[in-house]
Regions:
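Long helical/loop segments within the catalytic core of UDP-sugar-dependent glycosyltransferases
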Residues: 1-36, 172
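Loop-to-transmembrane-helix entry motif
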Residues: 6, 10, 110, 114-118
């Protein structure tokens, strides 16, 4: 929420929390496609019509944790794929000549964050090329391989119960990276995106 507080001071937040947000009635668009992310789009719709979306620090919402890492993975894939599809639907908001710093905030906070998973394969390839050029650097890709293997073990362990922290953190990071890849494939593939009933809080 710290980032959203900064965005509010800077002008407008670029995405609302689906569990806890409100929008003015005359800005609400009932015709908005159901398979897109309405909470994310609410901020974009407000900005398009000359309003801004803000984060209220005094608002408190308790959100239960996902029951397992697999559920968290599915949640990440779903929300990211819907977010990407929504951003494409409202892509003109990325035009800095029309929407100024909001376009920059939208690209840096959303699009760049949804591309973070690309750093994993890029790092592995880069380390492999470095080691190929100079054998002294072979420990680096080897360490990366071990880290990824530990992540897989942590993810697998979470299906049996609570994983030790040394395994849980790499498992969570790996699940997030794989979810990023899966979300992009789903969004680019044009597959229908699930519509679900939000958890009551």
């Amino acid at each position: 929420m710290w980032v959203r507080s900064l965005e509010t001071r800077f002008g407008s937040i670029v995405g609302a929390s689906g569990c806890f947000y409100a929008i003015r009635r005359h800005l609400h668009r009932p015709d908005f496609p159901a398979d897109l992310s309405r909470d994310f789009a609410s901020c974009i719709i407000a900005r398009r019509q000359g309003y801004r979306a803000v984060s209220v620090d005094d608002a408190v919402c308790y959100v239960p944790r996902a029951g397992s890492l697999d559920r968290e993975y599915r949640r990440k894939v779903r929300t990211m794929a819907r977010g990407l599809s929504t951003l494409w639907h409202e892509r003109e908001l990325l035009n800095p000549f029309r929407f100024g710093r909001f376009a920059w905030m939208l690209a840096s906070h959303k699009l760049v964050r949804w591309l973070v998973w690309l750093t994993w394969p890029a790092a592995v390839v880069g380390l492999g090329l470095l080691a190929w050029a100079d054998p002294r650097f072979w420990p680096l890709p080897a360490a990366a391989g071990v880290a990824i293997a530990v992540g897989w073990v942590g993810w697998w362990w979470s299906r049996r119960g609570s994983a030790p922290r040394l395994l849980a953190l790499p498992g969570y990071a790996l699940a997030g990276a794989v979810a990023g890849f899966a979300a992009w494939m789903r969004a680019l593939g044009g597959a229908p995106l699930a519509v679900w009933e939000p958890t009551r809080r």
